[in-house]
């Protein structure tokens, strides 16, 4: 009989017969509290903080809580199959690890640890452009695991082109393009700590190892790290991008392209018109815009847009 996803709970109980208990709490609220106790205010605020007054993050949770499960009884569920097909790939469950940057502020093994965990369970790992570890090293840690690459779309076309070539060579099979970060959000928890990890050279590994990025520096990164950081800040995002610019990505990426941060059904239609393969209905976990519509509330409209892209994953943040 195939192993079910929830079999691990029985392992916990069986281990308890020898006096062993889980090393970490299984309650996510307690796990978050433990993380806040062990990490400094800067990392915690950066990971858990929201834009403005936090209203979008609260709306995300409230919207999900409004969607309730209605169980049905006396159904044959001895064989439970959660597998789905996404972007032409068969996945064991409708689950992927979303891109999270600067993971070294949370764990010393950063993105490599997350990639190994995803591969061990057969779920895709989406690597952030703003990772603490170069994409080639993360790909090696992922092994044969399904891996996708998230792009923060830089001003410099040559840097973007270089990122796409490197990601393809490293075995990343799909491209997720974040659209909802044309500018840095107003995040009070970060501002109150004056903490932005990129200014400390964290989350810049893909840039500092990129030949096109380094070509724009007067000195090597190790000789003038501050100049490298300023160059990164100046070219990280481009608020002037518009829909026709997507043609550049299609010309330079052979695999599926998914647009992350779509909330309006008209934008889902525009994505389809531009030849995109999917959208992620997301508000960046409330990190970018205070007062935004909740992702779960946008999902029916964005996912149901006639003529929209086929694949519509959703993240809460």
Segments and roles (model prediction):
Residues 119-160:
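A gly/proline- and charged-residue-enriched helix-loop-helix capping module
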Residues 51-52, 129-133, 155, 263, ...:
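Short beta->alpha linker loops
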Residues 47, 125-127, 148-151, 258-259, ...:
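Short catalytic-loop micro-motif centered on adjacent basic/acidic residues
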Residues 102, 116, 141, 158-316:
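Alpha/beta enzyme core
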Residues 1-88, 194-241:
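An N-cap/entry alpha-helix motif that binds or orients negatively charged groups
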Residues 91-133:
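Glycine-rich active-site/cofactor-binding loop and its immediate structural neighborhood
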Residues 68, 83-85, 94-98, 124-126, ...:
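Short, conserved beta-strand segments within well-ordered enzyme catalytic domains
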Residues 96-102, 145-152, 230-232:
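Short, basic, glycine/proline-bearing loop/turn elements
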